[in-house]
Design a protein with these regions (language model features):
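Short, low-complexity N-terminal intrinsically disordered segments enriched in polar/charged residues
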Residues: 8, 12-60, 94, 98, ...
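A short acidic/glycine-rich loop-to-helix N-cap element
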Residues: 122-127, 156-160
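Short beta-strand edge/turn micro-motifs at domain boundaries
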Residues: 108, 130-157
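Beta-strand elements of well-folded, non-transmembrane domains
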Residues: 115-121, 137
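A solvent-exposed, acidic/Ser-Thr-rich amphipathic alpha-helical stretch
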Residues: 33-36, 51-107, 112-114, 127-129, ...
Length: 160
């Protein structure tokens, strides 16, 4: 092969490789943005006490670890629906320190963040809690769903 032909083939190869990596990178950014948006929508439904919408973000095979232990989606739906049905209300939800990791295949993700929740209890008492939440999400049939959640108290920050 002559030098011009080698250079032309090399240029085509580099161009194809560049386009491939740009597309892969754009997919990761898009997946990360989709997960961030899902987390915002799910927590907005939580804040609004909109249980049907809130639970729509969870996969049927969902499991979670709360301070009280492990449970599945039917148990969580029953417990949380009862809690809200008794007159308790989430008043405010603020997310911070969101960190999203997308798996190599683009259909798995972990979202971890601090969640500040203000709740008005049925007796009128208002509670403010800060917790650490980590959600594992799978993209199935084109939709992201939370398949696992871990929720625990955030360490108390020291005031200086």
């Amino acid at each position: 092969m002559n030098r011009k032909r080698v250079m032309a083939i090399s240029a085509v190869f580099v161009s194809v490789a560049f386009l491939f990596f740009v597309k892969v990178g754009a997919g990761t950014t898009s997946a990360e943005q989709e997960v961030r948006e899902l987390e915002q929508r799910a927590n907005a439904a939580y804040e609004a006490n909109d249980l049907p919408k809130y639970f729509s973000f969870y996969a049927p095979d969902f499991t979670q670890y709360l301070p009280e232990g492990r449970s599945d989606l039917p148990a969580y739906q029953k417990e949380w629906s009862s809690y809200i049905g008794e007159g308790n209300r989430v008043e405010k939800v603020v997310l911070s320190d969101m960190h999203v990791q997308i798996g190599p295949s683009g259909d798995t993700a972990v979202a971890s963040y601090i969640i500040h929740v203000r709740t008005k209890l049925k007796d009128g008492k208002v509670t403010d809690e800060e917790n650490q939440e980590s959600d594992v999400l799978f993209k199935r049939n084109g939709q992201w769903k939370v398949v696992f959640l871990h929720y625990s108290a955030a360490p108390k920050s020291e005031s200086h």
